Amino acid sequence: MKTARASYVGIVAVGIAVLLTASQLRSTAQPTIDPAIRIGASDLGGRVTSANGPEAGVWVIAETTDLPTRFIKIVATDDRGRYLIPELPKANYSVWVRGYGLVDSTKVRTAPGKFLDLNAVVAPNAAAAAEYYPAIYWYSMLKVPEKSDFPGTGPQGNGIPVALKSQTQWLDVVKTNGCYTCHQLGNKATRAIPKELGDFKNSEEAWARRIVSGQAMTQMTNNIKRLDPPRAYKLFADWTDRIAAGELPASKPARPQGVERNIVITLWDWAGPKDYLHDEISTDKRKPTVNANGLIYGTPEESTDLFPVLDPVNHKATQVKMPVRDPNTPSSKQNPMTPSPHWGPGPIWDSQTSMHNPMFDEKGRVWFTSRVGAPANPDFCKKGSEHPSAKLFPLEESNRHLSMYDPKTGKITLIRTCFPTHHLVFAEDANNTLWTSAGGPGSGVIGWLNRKMFEATGDEQKSQSWTALILDTNGNGKRDDYVEPDQPVDPTKDKRVVAAFYGVGVNPLDGTIWGTVLGFPGYVIRLNPGSNPPATALAEVFEPPLPGYGPRGMDIDRNGVVWTPLSSGHLASFDRRKCKGPLNGPTATGQHCPEGWTLHPYPGPQLMNVTDPGSAEASYYAWVDQFDTFGLGRNVPIGTGNANEALLALVNGKFVVLRVPYPMGFYAKWMDGRIDDPNAGWKGKGLWSTYATRTPFHVEGGKGTTSKVVKFQLRPDPLAR
C-alpha cells in the first residue's frame, strides 16, 4: 500500500443575511465593456470588484423562478475578476456575488444579453466570512476521543463499548458509516441547536433528544449506541457549545483555482419539500450518448413512491408513481418516530417502494432497485425449491427488488427477486446481465438478472440467480464444499464469508464483478462467476490497510482498477495486478495484498484529536468518468465530497474541487456523465448529480427547500460561451 500526497484547490460558500448600505450593494450603472467579455443575447457578463479591487475566484449566481421550475446558474470569476454566465433561458434573474472572504452582495434584477458589473462586499469580520464555509470546516471542530482512550472496556470501565478497539473504529461511526451516512454534519442546521427542539438542562440532553427526531430515529439511535452514548452526547454538545460561544474553524477554504474557475454549474428544483432523493440517472453507464438531451430520473427512497423526472431542456419537473405488486407492502410511514422540530408530530415520509438506485439500459429504459412486496420470499426462493440458486443457498426474505420503466410507453414492469437489492449495474456481455448489490452484509449473497432471458420469456424466476460468497481457501481454483463463517479455515475446503456488496461494478476487461462490503475495516470483493454460476462462482476478498478503513460506494475504470471512498477520509484505489502473493488458498483471506492499495487523502481539515492521515471528509460514493463525459480526461475517478459540498475529481494525483456554492448543503450519493453532442465541445457534455441528503430542510433556505438536479460543465476558460 502507498499513500499519495494529494494537494487540492478548494472552493465553497453559502449565504447569510447582512445589512449593508445601498452604495455597497449597487451594481455599476455604466459598466466598462472589456473586449474579452463577448456576450450574446442569452449571456450575462461583466466584472466583479470590491473595496480590495478585482475579485478573482468568486462566484456569480443567477437565479430565477420565472420558468416552470426554479433555475440557477453559477460561474466563477477569472484572475481579473471577470465573469460570463452562458446560455441563460429567457427570464428575469436575481444576480449576486458570493465568495470566500466576502458576504453576499445585494441581488440585482436583470435579464440576459447585458453587461453587468457587480460590487462584491468584503466580510466585516472572520465570523461573517466563516458562515460561507463548507460543512467540513465546521465539522472538523468536533473533538473525538484520544487514541489512548481505546480499547473500550465497557460500562464498568471507560464507558466505550468493548467492540471499539481503536479510535479509527469510533471515527468510522461518526463519519461515512454512521452519523454522516444520510445527511451532512457541520452545516448551519446541525452546528446549532434549533430552539424549536425544546428547552433542556444542557446541550447533552438536547443532543439526546435531537437524534430521535423524525422517522429516522431508529437508525440514528442504533448508530449512537455503537459509540458510548453519554460520551458521544458530551462531545457533540461541546462542539455546538463552542460554536455558539463564537469559536471559528481553524482553517479556511481556498477560492477556486485553475480549471475550477472554468466550471459552469446549473441547478433545477425537481422534488417536493418533504421528499428526499438518493440518486439520479441521465444515461447508460456503458454508452453515455444514450438519452442525449433527454429526461433525468431520480429515486426518492423512503420518502415517496413518486419518482421525479426533470426535462432540462424545457426546465420542467414532473413525477411518476412507482407501484407495488402487493398492496399490503409496508410503508416508511409506519416507522417509529418522535416529533420533528421542523415538521412537527406527523410523518412526512410515505413510501412502499423504497426506490434506491436507477440505471439506464441501451434502449433508453430506466431500471430501479425498488420494493415489490413484503420481505417474506415466495417458495421458489426457499429451502426445498428446485431453483438452482435456492438449492445451493436458499433465501427466506428480501427487502427490495427490481423494476423497469419504459419512457416510450409509460409501462412499469415489476420483478420480484429472492435476493435483496440496493445498487445495480449492467455488464457489457451478451446477456446484458444486471448485477445488483444488497446494501448491508447480512444477506450474504449477490444477485443478478439475465436480462436477455427475461426479455425473451418474461419469466422472473428462471431469469434470476444469486450466490453466496465463497473463498477458494483450499487453493485448487474451483468451488468445493465449504466451511461456514463461524468455522476455522479448513485447508481441504473452501470458506463462506458473511458479506454482501454495497457498491457494485463490473470490470470491463474480464467481466468479473466487484463490490464493497460495509463494516470496519470493510472490504472490496471480487466475484468471478465462472462458466456455470452460481455453482462455479468464487470470491476474493481484500481489506484496505490502515490508515484506510470503511469503504462505501465504488466504481471501476476501464483498466480494471477499483476506486472507493474510505471513511478514513481517503479516495482509495485497488489494483489487483499489483498483488505479489497467492490470490487464493488459506492465507488469502483479506490482508494478503496491501501493495494493491493506494490512498489519496481527500481535501479539507482533519477532525480534532486525530493525527492519522486523511481528512474529516465523509465521502459516500465514487464514480469513474470512463469516457471523458466532463472534460478532465478518461478514467478520472470522482468522489462525492459530502462534507466538502462538492464533487472531488482526482486528476494526476491532485484533487479538482467541483464545489456547489449555492444553496449551501450540497450532498451527493451518486453522479453520472452524459454526452449530448460529441461535436459540440464542452457544451455537449457534462456531469449530473442531485442533492441527496435525507434532510433537504437542512440545506440553505431551510424548510421548504427541495432537492435539486445539478449539472457540471467544464469550459476551456472562465469567459468561454
Feature map (PLM): residue ranges:
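Short, conserved, GDST-rich strand-edge loop motifs in beta-rich repeat architectures
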Residues: 189-196, 291, 298-301, 368-398, ...
